[in-house]
Amino acid sequence: MALVKYSTVFFPLRSLRLFVSIKKAYYHSEPHSIDLFHDKDWIVKRPKFLNLPKNEHSKLDIFQFNFNKSESNNVYLQDSSFKDNLDKAMQFIYNDKLSSLDAKQVPIKNLAWLKLRDYIYQQLKDPKLQAKTYVPSVSEIIHPSSPGNLISLLINCNKISNLVWKSVLKYSLSNNITTLDKFIHVLQQTFDHVYEQEILPMMTNTDDTDGAHNVDITNPAEWFPEARKIRRHIIMHIGPTNSGKTYRALQKLKSVDRGYYAGPLRLLAREVYDRFHAEKIRCNLLTGEEVIRDLDDRGNSAGLTSGTVEMVPINQKFDVVVLDEIQMMSDGDRGWAWTNALLGVVSKEVHLCGEKSVLPLVKSIVKMTGDKLTINEYERLGKLSVEEKPIKDGIKGLRKGDCVVAFSKKKILDLKLKIEKDTNLKVAVIYGSLPPETRVQQAALFNNGEYDIMVASDAIGMGLNLSIDRVVFTTNMKYNGEELMEMTSSQIKQIGGRAGRFKSRSASGGVPQGFITSFESKVLKSVRKAIEAPVEYLKTAVTWPTDEICAQLMTQFPPGTPTSVLLQTISDELEKSSDNLFTLSDLKSKLKVIGLFEHMEDIPFFDKLKLSNAPVKDMPMVTKAFTKFCETIAKRHTRGLLSYRLPFNLLDYNCIPNESYSLEVYESLYNIITLYFWLSNRYPNYFIDMESAKDLKYFCEMIIFEKLDRLKKNPYAHKPFGSTRGHLSSSRRRLRT
């Protein structure tokens, strides 16, 4: 085959065109897909071995580690027990991972072996290795994901109790467990990590990747082979708001040994977690930002877990999984999480709670998967009425128990200030960028009667218990990110249905009733039409390939392909071949996040996929902080949140009355802190000192609450939405002095 030299790499002549396409796509403002699925002769890009002795590059069956006299000050040479265990474990790994391979697998696994040894040499040569102060977490023991911390993990593996180790290794309580057993487990897992995340993504598309490309990318049901091995029972609980759907599903969940509640918000996951514990039912909590394991005296986790839908362990076996708000599977941004969970959870029963609009879509999916389907329909527990006329006298016509709905922070805070100025009513507020804890506080003040009126966005549509008598729509239009659009009947029903939902029975003993109205006749007419409209059935489920499938597909791309190009190409290929049942998740927000770290070459491909799902709010202060966090991952540093140059000096009680520090600054700080928690759960070796982070989070929540309570003027009245640049730069100047 003819070869063309490009820099120091030789490419097949017929592949040069695609290489140039990649270079163009990489530097273009918008990532372009490239036609790679039919051109697969790529040259392997070998990993670099900067610390491995040259004589070991070709000779593989070496299990010991060799150092010169100047490098003798390391644990391997000074601790004979450590040396003996490491040598024996390395020999075991070699025999287990390399000796029994067929000829096609050998070259790739050899590279993983050499890279593993290179990591070990690098750390043993490091005089600044802070191994003795390092305390590994249980998650690091189970699935080590940071080869750069391997030696520290081995040195400190005995800090994890043997009971936990026996659970990890599936030893019986009567069996003894040795340090060598622990070394072997950690090294096996680290070898697999290096092989799958660092070596495979650089390989050619050949048969030596264990059938990685056999997955049918055009059929999402086949992405989850474990779920296809069993015939699951899908049980639907469908009905309007306040019909008891989720309650019935949770009753079933309580009765089993292994189960998962998957909610749309961490606020809801926490609510179920707290409810179970109040009923003396053991339960774990699993959200992107918070993980709480309910352990018994022997270190065994509870069988039930409450969490967010994105965190569902797809391949873990369950008796019951509850997917709440299943109609969210059509959401362009997050719908993939519901769709993938429905297709992929390995559970005897899968309970789906949601609106009737999703029924035909679920029927089609269940027909595709071959599962059994049972449908339970429920009616609303209370009455819901649309008032005949709009409210007289505008704001002065509001009464205690009303919830006024608006769709921007500026409008919501304008309404709060105007209502409190023109009436004697006290106003609580809820909108999407408020911390969940603050939303709970505001809801509690409204529910217990301390505050009279609630002014809120569509954030009240799910996740909060609110004792609303009447929902008052200020408009029937909502900005969708690109243009102002009329709200769908489903959206109006979801919000309007909150009226009367958590009210007790009326004084006369009748069924509790909720009301819907508006300030304007035109809006009220539109709302009534939507409430009375027939069900709008959802037509497509939003999906996206798992990180594992994306990684398998990456082996079909040449080395150095930007992550954004890979994702765009997958999206385009699926759109071409997929039927109308599934559609692809909107890439805009994902690509915007990827753009913050894509240039960082030291972040492995798998980590880039993981980071593309980070909850990064589109606020200048937040995106800058996330970029700094990604640099920490790229450099494999260990840092606490306070070590970053961020304006945490504003988390001071004296700043509360200072109106130059707006709510938005504190909302940005809060999002940075929760982003740090999200990263710490995935990179516990890099992001540490969670106690300080928890304190900062608490202070931030407190100040936001106080800022709302003392609000005298709207901080969004005279500046573009989302701008925190002025506050950030002035705060940084203070931090430098």
Swiss-Prot record:
Q: Which Pfam families match?
A: DEXQc_Suv3 (PF22527), Helicase_C (PF00271), SUV3_C (PF12513)
Q: Which InterPro entries match?
A: DEXQc_SUV3, Helicase_ATP-bd, Helicase_C-like, P-loop_NTPase, RNA-DNA_Helicase, SUV3_C, Suv3_DEXQc
Q: What Gene Ontology cellular-component terms does the record carry?
A: mitochondrial degradosome; mitochondrial matrix; mitochondrion
Gene symbol?
A: SUV3
Additional notes on this entry = Present with 1440 molecules/cell in log phase SD medium.
> Its principal location?
mitochondrion
Spell out the family assignment given in the record's similarity comment.
Answer: Belongs to the helicase family.
Purpose of the protein = Required for intron-independent turnover and processing of mitochondrial RNA. It is a key control element in nuclear-mitochondrial interactions.
Name any Gene Ontology BP term: mitochondrial RNA catabolic process
Q: Specify the species.
A: Saccharomyces cerevisiae (strain ATCC 204508 / S288c)
| Protein name as it appears in the record | ATP-dependent RNA helicase SUV3, mitochondrial
Domain Helicase C-terminal per the UniProt entry, residue ranges: 390-546
Annotated residues that bind ATP are located at G239, P240, T241, N242, S243, G244, K245, T246
Q: Where in the cell is it found?
A: Mitochondrion matrix
Q: How does it assemble?
A: MSU1 and SUV3 are the two components of the mitochondrial degradosome (mtEXO).
Task: List, alphabetically, the SMART domains matched.
Answer: DEXDc, HELICc
